[in-house]
Amino acid sequence: IKKVKREISKDSFWALKDISFNVKKGEAVGLVGKNGCGKSTMLKTIAGVLTPTMGTVKVNGTVAPMIELGAGFDPELTARENIFLNGAILGYPQEMLKERFDEIIDFAELKDFVDVPVKNFSSGMTTRLGFSIATIYTPDILIVDEILAVGDFAFQKKCEKRIGDMLNSGTTLLLVSH
């Protein structure tokens, strides 16, 4: 990240101003701060969801962003359909998603809800599905923006283990919390 600025409105409110840092492969970096200080904006900029108003962001490798609850999901589609939609958005090959479909559903604990539209899911169910899809493939960079807080304790522990396994495999982690 080099001299990144992100203007939110034309009234000169800068969510990010002159932010510069480097993260090495395999590092785990936490961004901590008050609400509204720019943490989520920074992660969205790194993930390519937002573009900086000024400055540059250079990312080497594949990114699995877990930024907003339900991002990349169509609420009218079923969990099954959303696995392929969200996987395509993340750049995962359809063949790989087919091969690992059961693993995604099993990790998300949604076997009985595969053919239910996501609009009927609780926030925890949506989080489980999103995390399971994003982490079925070991990315170079995993971005997690506070969304795991909505999952239950047992699922949070499963996520922590999977993230730990990814870190041990060399994945870089960017994590936001308060």
Predicted regions and their residues:
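Helix-to-loop junction immediately C-terminal to a conserved catalytic motif
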Residues: 47
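Helical segment within the ABC ATPase nucleotide-binding domain
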Residues: 156-169
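The feature captures the beta-strand-to-loop junction immediately N-terminal to the Walker
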Residues: 32-34
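Pre-NBD coupling/linker segments of ABC/ABC-like ATPases
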Residues: 1-18
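A short, proline-enriched helix->beta-strand linker immediately N-terminal to the Walker B motif
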Residues: 132-144, 150
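Conserved ABC ATPase "signature" region
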Residues: 1-2, 84, 96-113
